[in-house]
């Protein structure tokens, strides 16, 4: 895997050039995430050296972030970079943005998000 060094004030990160996008997880017949297949997909990506994982609030009818939070629990948090996006269509105030950010932290079962888009 090739990596790009991302420099910022106070340090740098080596982020894989190829990321894992979580908008198209495998689905079961009822349209929900096939968690067994999706977890296997995540494991293959991480084992291949992918360390940038991207999701968003609305992916899979809102279930991508909660699933990803559960699935990533078995990996050390410092072994991957997590990206998600602010659902701007739900934001009418700074308070809305803050509330949604806290909600996304909870959904992802993490204390921080590396890249918030």
What are these regions (language model features)?
Residues 1-80:
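N-terminal binding-site loop/beta-alpha segment at the start of enzyme catalytic domains
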Residues 16, 74, 87-88, 107:
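Proline-rich low-complexity regions
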Residues 29, 91-117:
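Glycine/proline-rich, positively charged
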Residues 54-58, 87-94:
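Short gly/ser-rich anion-binding loops that grip negatively charged ligand groups
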Residues 67-70, 85, 96-103:
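Generic beta-strand or strand-like secondary-structure segments
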Residues 78-90, 115-117:
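A short, structured active-site edge motif that brings together acidic residues
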